């Protein structure tokens, strides 16, 4: 619905406004295939990749738990330096995993 409506606006305002269609994706490495399909299906003018969550510990079953980078629990059991390193490592892992999802991908890291 979003993409179709934006295309209608592009047509309606052609010659008056240069309307671009974009999307922001909260990056998690396990969503790579889904994001690749999405960006192939819709020819976005730009895609913003962001990091809103970082892994901070595992639960008793070994599942990775994520938290907001600004959350106190990220800093609870580690030094500031360790917490910031974890955020940067998560960002780097996403950049390595996603590279360019398509020719129009722009990665903006938001922590």
Listing of model-derived features with the role each one plays in the protein:
Residues 2-111:
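Extended substrate/RNA-proximal surfaces in nucleic-acid metabolism proteins
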């Amino acid at each position: 619905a979003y993409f179709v409506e934006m295309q209608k606006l592009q047509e309606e305002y052609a010659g008056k406004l240069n309307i671009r269609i974009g999307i922001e994706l909260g990056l998690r490495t396990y969503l790579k295939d889904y994001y690749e399909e999405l960006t192939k299906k819709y020819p976005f003018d730009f895609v913003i990749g962001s990091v809103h969550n970082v892994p901070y510990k595992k639960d008793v079953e070994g599942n990775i738990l994520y938290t907001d980078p600004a959350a106190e629990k990220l800093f609870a059991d580690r030094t500031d330096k360790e917490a910031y390193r974890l955020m940067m490592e998560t960002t780097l892992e996403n950049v390595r995993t996603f590279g360019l999802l398509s020719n129009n991908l722009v990665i903006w890291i938001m922590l």
